[in-house]
Amino acid sequence: MSSDPQAVSGKSAALAGRTLVVTRPQEQADSLCRRIEVAGGHTIRFPVLAIAPAPDTAQLEAIVPRLDEFDLAFFVSPNAIHHALDFVLARRSWPAGLRVATVGKGSERVLLQRGFLEPIVPQDGFDSESVLALPEFAAAAIRGRKVLIFRGDGGRDLIRDTLRERGAQVEYVTCYRRYCPQLDPAILLQPAARGELDALLLTSSEGVRNLALILGGEGLRALHDVPVFASHARIAVQARDAGFAKVIETPAGDDGLLQALTKYFG
């Protein structure tokens, strides 16, 4: 829980009049934008990552009748939950004995909303390492178990590889794809030229790469002096490597971002 109740509630005056660029996928930006705007800030939505259903549903089709074989299903993100469950539950009920796990408060909230009352979720971290530190994923608990990972195309393989080393049988199912959308760089470059951008909020490593692709080298350099708020150490490293001069690492999630923004601008 945040130690700054104003940052969490959105009632601080620190963001009043500030213009913040939210780069999350369109479907996931509403809550954060709303909280910034309640705090008096302005948001520019610039979704550097787009999400779509997997173009080939063969893996999903094949896994539906086999779900009862598995002991644990891990969803890598809210997108994985939505795309996998929409597909599966249109064809069958979820097996009573198949436990679910995920990472991040947003993903946990989605599972609870979907009716999974006791998802396995790390409370002290928001990455693969925090998942692997859970007792349910320890070698003694996972050895011999069959684990299904619902994910997008690409991404880190750390959970799969580590669980296999610990003796689990692990299968992937790709249920959505991520891609770099076509956006007009002028949406950012024009206000930046007028000195009207106060911060960029970057919440994925892939988003940093896509931002560079969308803006091009000259466009990216035009933003190098805009403060960047990065919600993970890996994202912060990529932002610095991309040339941003001021990178503030924040805790993951909306609360962490808002707390860091309030502290910086307060």
Question: For each of these PLM feature ranges, what is it?
Answer:
Residues M1-G266:
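Conserved beta-alpha
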